[in-house]
Curated annotation (Swiss-Prot):
Catalytic activity of the protein: 4 porphobilinogen + H2O = hydroxymethylbilane + 4 NH4(+)
Positions of modified residues (S-(dipyrrolylmethanemethyl)cysteine): C242
Family from the record: Belongs to the HMBS family.
E.C. number(s) listed in UniProt: 2.5.1.61
The protein's role, per its UniProt record: Tetrapolymerization of the monopyrrole PBG into the hydroxymethylbilane pre-uroporphyrinogen in several discrete steps.
Protein's pathway: Porphyrin-containing compound metabolism; protoporphyrin-IX biosynthesis; coproporphyrinogen-III from 5-aminolevulinate: step 2/4
Cross-referenced Pfam families: Porphobil_deam, Porphobil_deamC
GO BP, sorted A to Z: protoporphyrinogen IX biosynthetic process
Keyword Transferase: yes
Protein name (Swiss-Prot/TrEMBL): Porphobilinogen deaminase
A GO MF label: hydroxymethylbilane synthase activity
Entry-linked PROSITE patterns: PORPHOBILINOGEN_DEAM
Quaternary structure annotation from Swiss-Prot or TrEMBL: Monomer.
């Protein structure tokens, strides 16, 4: 392996820096003589944190500048939360590794109430995710959803100030930051199905950089990668992004079968189309396509057309 310094592009948020350092530590463990530097960057998504992602341009804003750094060779690889990745990558880039998936579920945080079921009528719940909003309202239409933005610490501070009675965050982010003690309830996936690739870190690099691909290959977790790419296939075929209330989650059963579940909702949760497919691991792409076709047959695209663009 070359003696050059490897540069990792990352967002500047505390969670993103933790994730980049985590990947750095795993690489150094495999390649002890490796020299690695972080290249922290402020992305468009970070600048628009106070705005609605719908109007700001969506989840791709959190990776755009990092990908530009890869393409102009200021960075050798980029570390992302895979859930932030658009369905389509720019030409010249690929997801080289999907790290072992952490907790994929959503967490309720509330200083007053012990579960979703305990929330009173008209309780104010903080989230900026249409997926979470629609599933919350499908579970309990009497909840009041209020926009919540900022990094993890900012969101927790807003909860503590009394602005909300509860907030919803990704469990993985809280656990990575040593904040799992704030979790009141891990929300069951029959109430709130995760978003595509939630809980999984990915490493992106240039398609022509075979040296970097070899370097990070050992960080790829085959089962996590299989499940994440299956979810992303459904997401891509439905035109999925953070503009739509869409959830998809793939797991491997005890019987070593691939189980794929997906759902599409309208914004207030009053309408939902869901599907579940199961089959052999080797048929992951077929299962993903079958799930997509089933959702479409049931009217998913018509339902999604009701969502403001």
């Amino acid at each position: 392996m070359s003696a050059k310094i490897i540069r990792i592009a990352t967002r500047q948020s505390p969670l993103a820096l933790w994730q980049a350092n985590h990947v750095r530590e795993m690489l150094v463990k495999q390649w002890p003589n490796l020299s690695i530097e972080l290249l922290p960057m402020i992305t468009s998504g970070d600048r628009f944190l106070k705005d609605k992602l719908l109007s700001a341009g969506g989840k791709g804003l959190f990776v755009k500048e990092l990908e530009e750094a890869l393409l102009d060779k200021r960075a050798d690889l980029a570390v992302h939360s895979t859930k932030d990745m658009p369905a389509q990558l720019p030409d010249g880039l690929l997801l080289t590794a999907i790290c072992k998936r952490d907790n994929p579920f959503d967490a309720l945080i509330s200083p007053q109430f012990k579960s979703l079921a305990a929330l009173p009528k008209n309780a104010i719940i903080g989230t900026s995710s249409l997926r979470r909003q629609s599933q919350l309202l499908a579970y309990n239409p009497n909840l009041q959803i209020k926009t919540l933005r900022g990094n993890i610490h900012t969101r927790l501070s807003k909860l503590e100030s009394g602005e909300y009675q509860a907030i919803i965050l990704a469990a993985a982010g809280l656990e990575r930051m040593g904040l799992a003690h704030h979790i009141t309830q891990l929300i069951p996936d029959d109430i709130m199905l995760p978003t595509c690739a939630q809980g999984a870190l990915c490493i992106e690099c240039r398609t022509d950089d075979l040296e970097i691909q070899e370097l990070v290959h050992g960080l790829n977790d085959p089962i996590s990668a299989l499940c994440v790419h299956t979810e992303r296939r459904v997401n891509a075929k439905l035109g999925g992004n953070c503009h739509i209330p869409f959830a998809v989650y793939c797991t491997i059963t005890e019987e070593k079968l691939l189980l794929l579940r997906a759902k599409v909702l309208n914004m207030d949760g009053s309408q939902m189309i869901d599907d579940e497919q199961q089959g052999k691991i080797a048929e992951a792409e077929v299962i993903a396509d079958r799930c997509t076709e089933s959702l479409m047959t049931k009217g998913a695209m018509s339902l999604l057309s009701t969502i403001p663009s």
